[in-house]
Amino acid sequence: PVKWIIPGLLPAGLALFAGPSKAGKSWLTLWLCLQIAQGNPVWNREIEPRTVIYFSLEDTFNRLQNRIFQLIDGGDAPERLILQTECPSIGQGLEEQVDSLVHTYSDVGLIVIDTLQKVRLSDGNGGMYANDYKEAGSLKKLADKYGICILLIHHLRKQSASDPFDQISGSTGLMGVADTSWVMQRKRMSQTADILLTGRDMDDRTLHLREENCVWTLEDEETAEEREIKAVPDYLWKAAKYIESVGNWQG
């Protein structure tokens, strides 16, 4: 059976969450961490409280504390949320640090690395695909070993693509290893955003979100099948129903 961190959206395993720069990924990620650590609902889904370890590698503790204070409206940060602003790179001690943290906190469910680029070695040997596959594979091995989710915050390329998941920065090696991928689409300064989700253990779907006071709330969601149905013009559905009612068509 699939072990869900967020039912239907985020299972255990390796996950990617990619979006444009300055699109609000870190705010959204911190809110998710708080909700999971407190066992509060996420987008109409009931959450089992778990320890969350958040490597926020582009922030200071003061900035994180200010954001948490704003997100929880002056309340206390949950004990199950463990904040880290530094860690070694992949292959240089990160795996050992994760081992230690998982053994220290027995109910760890989610580890967030924000951002992936901060823990990469930038090794030019072997080519981009091989390096992406090796580094992501090392983290997936840890996620599978402990039955947890490791969520990597990442960037999108600026170039557009017909498939939004092709905009994830790096090679296809990252997507090839990841069990789950989220792509955030947001126009700059817009209060709305879409998150497209795909994964081995879930149906493809799109979440339509709205931001208010740095919290992203769910306005609507649809599966890939529902989205395809909506894309068909009404007159075609009416024609299909008419043909079905008369039994044949001559023209």
What residue spans do the PLM features occupy?
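Hydrophobic positions on the alpha1 helix immediately C-terminal to the Walker A/P-loop
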Residues: 28, 32
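Conserved, well-folded catalytic cores of nucleic-acid-processing
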Residues: 36-39, 71-74, 118-122, 142, ...
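Pre-Walker A adenine-sensing motif
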Residues: 1-10, 42
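Conserved inter-motif catalytic segment of the P-loop NTP-binding fold
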Residues: 5, 11, 47-134, 140-141, ...
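Phosphate-binding/switch region of NTP-binding enzymes
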Residues: 16-18, 22, 26-27, 53-55, ...
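Conserved alpha/beta core segments of nucleic-acid transaction machinery
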Residues: 199-250
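Post-Walker A helix-loop "phosphate-sensing" segment adjacent to the P-loop in P-loop NTPases
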Residues: 35-49
